[in-house]
């Protein structure tokens, strides 16, 4: 599947700072330990049944920042992202709206691409729909069955395939949740704990046997379609290797999705840990309530842009809070971001001396290197802008250095 164009950035003068990120599995901020010249990153993509809202955008903007810091540190980045283009929410929305689910998916994927391009988000090199990956998914299901890590339920009508939570010794290491928490989230987030025939209520579906009216693909274990978690296990490891650097997504994916994606890959491939760092973003709310398709309290990226909002202001609004924290979006947040963008642009015309700007850039780098502290980076630039608007001197070279740094590191165009 085609992604979207790569935004143009230039190299930033000065010395980059090594990136440190909070790892959900280890529960601490730690320096990325990247071996070789290429960093590998997998971020879970959308289920394409509605437009890109700011909750989605905040997640992809976070991993865009990570991508930019990796580039600044001299790494190449091998980035993969899936699209869950065959799943129940897509079927349900298509039925509600009286459209073909494939057409609905295609239209929303196209809109997602457009939104990501507008926001200057670096695209994945591997942008893969579940339907494109059926063969590799069935291979992983078969590997789990062969290893005794999965089983077929005793149901002649619907012989679904499940992965056992006992297949790996370290199940639970990624989320660090208690059994009680797992059971709660599993039931709330697409699990089926009461499915008859399962060995454990937490065992996860990896192949859903064909039901009338649903799409199906042939497999060695009968016609059907893939489960949600194993889709990412297969897509990620087939493109990034059995163990890669960063697995990312929203905090609501920590369990069950990321826990099971890791467990399936580890059991099938015989590795101890699928990702070296599990990075999760906080939820974006509107008036105190998490943005959610089911609740309908959404702010859409394309509608903001159609209303004349500068995409750089959207980025600054999202970055005004720390990526790991749950936070609110509001008209006030957007208004503040728009005013900030205008101040920075005005200040960039008379920014100060080259040496002063290099010090500003150095401090922005330090902030972003420490678990993407965008609030601190913004504060550094706010302080610079205040001084520059006071009595700074004009310097075309300094302006170029500043604009290059802010665009390359933050994706904000001055």
UniProtKB/Swiss-Prot annotation:
CDD domains: CysRS_core (cd00672). Its cofactor is Zn(2+). A motif ('ERGGDP' region) lies at residues 188-193. Keywords: ATP-binding, Ligase, Metal-binding, Nucleotide-binding, Zinc. The keyword Metal-binding applies. A motif ('KMSKS' region) lies at residues 290-294. It catalyses: 1D-myo-inositol 2-amino-2-deoxy-alpha-D-glucopyranoside + L-cysteine + ATP = 1D-myo-inositol 2-(L-cysteinylamino)-2-deoxy-alpha-D-glucopyranoside + AMP + diphosphate + H(+). GO terms for molecular function: ATP binding; cysteine-glucosaminylinositol ligase activity; cysteine-tRNA ligase activity; zinc ion binding. Zn(2+) binds at residues 44, 232, 257. InterPro entries: Cys-tRNA/MSH_ligase, Mycothiol_ligase_MshC, Rossmann-like_a/b/a_fold, tRNA-synt_1_cat_dom. Belongs to the class-I aminoacyl-tRNA synthetase family. MshC subfamily. NCBIfam families: mycothiol_MshC (TIGR03447). This is L-cysteine:1D-myo-inositol 2-amino-2-deoxy-alpha-D-glucopyranoside ligase. It comes from Corynebacterium aurimucosum (strain ATCC 700975 / DSM 44827 / CIP 107346 / CN-1) (Corynebacterium nigricans).
């Amino acid at each position: 599947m085609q992604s979207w164009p790569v935004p143009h950035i230039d190299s930033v003068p000065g010395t980059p700072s090594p990136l440190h990120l909070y790892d959900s599995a280890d529960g601490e901020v730690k320096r990325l330990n990247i071996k070789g010249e290429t960093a590998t990153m997998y971020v879970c993509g959308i289920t394409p049944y509605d437009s890109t809202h700011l909750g989605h955008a905040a997640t992809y903007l976070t991993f865009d920042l990570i991508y930019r810091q990796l580039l600044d540190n001299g790494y190449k980045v091998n980035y993969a992202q899936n699209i869950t283009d065959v799943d129940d929410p897509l079927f349900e929305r298509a039925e509600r709206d009286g459209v073909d689910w494939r057409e609905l998916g295609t239209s929303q994927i196209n809109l997602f691409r457009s939104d990501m391009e507008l926001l200057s988000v670096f695209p994945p090199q591997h942008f893969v729909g579940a339907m494109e990956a059926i063969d590799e998914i069935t291979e992983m299901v078969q590997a789990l069955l062969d290893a005794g890590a999965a089983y077929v339920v005793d149901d002649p009508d619907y012989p679904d395939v499940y992965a056992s939570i006992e297949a790996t010794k370290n199940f639970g290491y990624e989320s660090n949740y208690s059994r009680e928490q797992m059971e709660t989230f599993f039931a709330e987030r697409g699990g089926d704990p009461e499915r008859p025939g399962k060995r454990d209520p937490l065992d996860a579906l990896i192949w859903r046997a064909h039901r009338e009216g649903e799409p199906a693909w042939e497999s060695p274990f009968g016609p059907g379609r893939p489960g949600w978690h194993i889709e990412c296990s297969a897509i990620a490891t087939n493109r990034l290797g059995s163990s890669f650097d960063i697995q990312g997504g929203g905090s609501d994916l920590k369990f069950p999705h990321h826990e099971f994606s890791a467990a399936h890959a580890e059991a099938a491939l015989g590795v101890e840990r699928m990702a070296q760092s599990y990075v999760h973003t906080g939820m974006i709310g509107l008036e105190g309530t998490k943005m959610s398709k089911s609740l309908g309290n959404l702010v859409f990226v394309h509608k903001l842009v159609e209303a004349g909002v500068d995409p750089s202001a959207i980025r600054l609004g999202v970055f005004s809070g720390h990526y790991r924290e749950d936070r609110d979006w509001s008209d006030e947040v957007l208004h503040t971001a728009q005013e900030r963008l205008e101040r920075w642009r005005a200040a960039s015309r008379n920014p100060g001396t080259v040496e002063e700007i290099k010090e500003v850039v150095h401090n922005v780098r330090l902030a972003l290197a420490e678990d993407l502290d965008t609030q601190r980076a913004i504060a550094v630039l706010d302080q610079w802008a205040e001084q520059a608007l006071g009595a700074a001197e004009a310097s075309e070279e300094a302006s170029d250095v500043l604009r290059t740094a802010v665009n390359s590191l933050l994706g904000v165009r001055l």
